[in-house]
C-alpha cells in the first residue's frame, strides 16, 4: 500500500474502484485538527495525516468550533467503492487542553462499548481499536507538544443507528460503531484482483532471491514477526483470507519453506481443512477447538464452555483456566498436516511451519520450536 498512491484506483473486471479511508483515520484527523485549533485559537478547514500504511491523506474539516480551551471538529467517513455502514457519516473529536501532561482518550455518543471479552479491549471501554488509539494519541501529542495534556473524546451522533447495520452486537459491542483500521485505508476487496495483488507480492519476493516466506492474515502478524521473532519482515507476505490460494502460489513459485503466522481466530480454520478463512465462506472455530480439546482429554465442562463462546479469544481464557494451553502446539501441528495433505500431489512440497500468537503478541504454540523456525528463516 505504501508504494501506491491513494488516488490510484483498484481495478476489477475493467472497472476502476476508488479507495477510501477508515473510521480510525477520520478520528485521528478530527483529533489532530481539534488540538491544533484550540492551540492556535482559529478555525482550520483542512488537515493532513499520515496513515499507518504510509499514505498521506488531506481531508476536509466539518463543523469546526472553538470555545476557550476546548475545540471540536469532524471528518466525514468515505469508504470509497467499498461502501459500508459508516460511509458518509461524521466522526467527531472533542479536545480539551489541560496541564496534566497526559492524553486521555474516551468514546462518547455513538461509539460502541465493549461488553464481552475476546476482541482485545477491556470490558467497559470504548470500541476504539489499538491502532486508531495509537494514531489518535500520537497525532494529538504531535500537535500539543510534550508538556501539555489533553482529554480527547471521539463521538459520532449517527453511530448508534449505523451500528445496527454492522456485526457489532454479535461481538458484544453495544451502543455504537467501532473506530477501526490497521492501515487507515479502505481498499475495495474485489476478490480476484486482491488475490492477484497478493500473488504479485510473492512473485516480487521470489524474484529478489527469497526462498522462504512467512504468510500472515494481516498487519498484526507482520508486527508479531518483527517484534517477537526478530525476523526481517522482508519475508512477510499478507495472505488475507486466501490461505489455500497463497500456499499454492508459493509452491508454484518455488519457495522451499512456508511459515503460517497468525492468531488462532484465523489459523484454527486451517486445522479443519478450511483454506478460505472469511466467515462468509466457513466458520468452524469453536467446533474445531472443541474437537481437538476432546482428543486431548478435556473435560465435558470445558468443552461446553468453549462451545458456547462467541470468539476464539474468549475461548482461550477457558482453555488457559483449565490448563489445556498445550492444545496450541497440537493445533499448529494439525495445521501443517492439513497443508501437506492439500499439497499431497506436489512433486517437491515445501517445509511447512505454523505459529500461533495471542492479541498481546505472546507465542501460544507452534509445530516445532519457534527459535528453530526463526533460525532457518534467517539463513
Curated annotation (Swiss-Prot):
- Name the pathway: Cofactor biosynthesis; adenosylcobalamin biosynthesis; cob(II)yrinate a,c-diamide from sirohydrochlorin (anaerobic route): step 6/10
Q: GO molecular function: any one?
A: cobalt-precorrin-5B C1-methyltransferase activity
Q: Which GO terms describe its biological process?
A: anaerobic cobalamin biosynthetic process; methylation
Known catalytic reactions = Co-precorrin-5B + S-adenosyl-L-methionine = Co-precorrin-6A + S-adenosyl-L-homocysteine
Family matches, as SUPFAM superfamilies:
CbiD-like
The top EC class is transferase
Q: Which family does it belong to?
A: Belongs to the CbiD family.
Name the UniProt record assigns to this protein: Cobalt-precorrin-5B C(1)-methyltransferase
What is the native source organism of this protein?
Salmonella dublin (strain CT_02021853)
